[in-house]
Every structure is written in C-alpha cells, then in structure tokens.
C-alpha cells in the first residue's frame, strides 16, 4: 500500500550501521571476519552484486580486480558483497578465471543484514541489487549508486568518483565540477560565480 510509512531511507552523509560477517579472502584461500571496525580510518568501497555464478557480476568484479592497484594506491579497500555463502564465494573463485583475478574480500551476507541496512536487498528474492557505496574514514557514505540487474558498472568511473570524494574531503572549500579529473581545476563556491558558469 502506497501509504505504508517507511523508515527514513539511507542517504549520502549517513554513517553506516555496525555489522560483522564472514568473508572469503582470495589469495590466502582463507575465511576471515570483517566488521565495521575494520573500515575506520580509511576509505572503503562496498560493491554489492546479485549472485555468484552469474553473467554480469563476474565482468564487474574482474573490472574492479583490473583496477585494484589504483584503488590501493589511493588507500581504498574494496569489498565485494552478495548474499551467497563464503563457501560459495570460494567455489566461484576456484572455478572462474575472471573471479580468480580478484584480491579483495568477498563478504557473505547470507543473513541479509548488510544488504538490508544499505537498502539494496530484494526481499522477495534474497539477493542484493547492484549497489556501490564509497565510505569515508569516518564510516560516512560519500557516494552511492544503484543500477538495475542488466547494467554493469565501470571501475574507472568509480575510481574518478573516489578521487573527487577524497579531494573534496581534503579541500572542504572547493568542489569538483562535471568530468573533473585529478590535477584539473576545481571550483570555490562564492557569490562571484553565481550566474557565470
């Protein structure tokens, strides 16, 4: 019913809710525990995807893997998240050439709690939407993007958004215009600029 009242939706500038879950850590072939405390003091990307052993998802995760070193150079940790189990994540890693490239943890959200707290859970299916969240060192959401099932995401575009978010955090009196790239001019909002752009 359209009059049903919802709780307030998650928004930019919201602090993320505490969480704790098991993840598969590629490379070490080990299962690790990841919780909200691990995020503090650094930049993070939460990359929700619908399911392991699918079609668009491995292309996205491989694209992130291909750009992983660039994210790491910027001090950004990446977490892939789906509602599959950590065992399923490992089986996918062991059997897929594309997924075999990744170095970042794949979090299991098989209780749906993380997907639900980020409001990307498709309750009727028990799967997450394609949701991307850039989280700053204070555990505050700075960028969020949700795309439909058939639309894959671009890691290079995400990298640019993270660079802009980091720049604005470090330079709070400046803003990054459209198509801004690192090293290019920014804007300093003032009355002098009104109507002149």
Q: Can you say where each PLM-predicted feature lies in the sequence?
A:
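Short active-site neighborhood of thiol/selenol oxidoreductases, capturing the structured segment around
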Residues: 35-64, 158
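Short loop/turn microsegments at loop-to-beta-strand junctions
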Residues: 17, 43-45, 129-131
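Conserved helix-turn-beta segment immediately C-terminal to the redox Cys motif
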Residues: 52, 59-81, 96-97
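Single conserved hydrophobic/aromatic residue that forms the stacking wall/gate
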Residues: 1-12
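Thiol-/selenol-based redox modules, centered on thioredoxin-like
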Residues: 128-197
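Short, acidic, Ser/Thr-enriched surface-loop or helix-capping motifs
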Residues: 5, 24-26, 135-136
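A short beta-strand-turn-helix
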Residues: 20-44
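Short, internal strand/loop/helix patches
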Residues: 79, 90-129
């Amino acid at each position: 019913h359209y009059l049903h009242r919802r709780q307030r939706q998650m928004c930019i500038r919201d602090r993320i809710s505490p969480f704790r879950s098991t993840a598969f850590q590629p490379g070490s072939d080990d299962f690790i525990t990841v919780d909200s405390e691990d995020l503090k003091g650094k930049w993070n990307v939460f990359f929700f995807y619908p399911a392991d052993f699918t079609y668009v998802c491995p292309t996205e995760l491989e694209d992130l893997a291909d750009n992983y070193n660039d994210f790491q150079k910027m001090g950004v940790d990446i977490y892939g998240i789906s509602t599959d189990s950590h065992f399923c994540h490992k089986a996918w890693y062991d059997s897929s050439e594309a997924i075999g490239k990744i170095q970042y943890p794949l979090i299991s959200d098989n209780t749906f709690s993380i997907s639900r707290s980020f409001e990307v859970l498709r309750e009727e299916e028990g799967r997450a939407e394609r949701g991307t969240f850039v989280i700053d060192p204070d555990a505050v959401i700075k960028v969020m993007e949700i795309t439909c099932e058939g639309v894959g995401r671009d890691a290079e575009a995400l990298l640019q958004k993270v660079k802009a978010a980091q720049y604005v955090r470090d330079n709070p009196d400046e803003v990054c215009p459209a198509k801004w790239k690192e090293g290019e001019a920014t804007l300093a909002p003032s009355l002098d600029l009104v109507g002149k752009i």
